[in-house]
């Protein structure tokens, strides 16, 4: 997703 690691996790959760 974005540059933040948390954003990558959110991208997985959103599918």
UniProtKB/Swiss-Prot annotation:
Question: Its domain of life?
Answer: Eukaryota
Additional record remark:
On the 2D-gel the determined pI of this unknown protein is: 6.2, its MW is: 45.0 kDa.
Protein name per UniProt: Unknown protein from spot 502 of 2D-PAGE of etiolated coleoptile
Question: Which organism's genome codes for this protein?
Answer: Zea mays
């Amino acid at each position: 997703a974005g540059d933040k690691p948390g954003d990558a996790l959110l991208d997985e959760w959103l599918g």
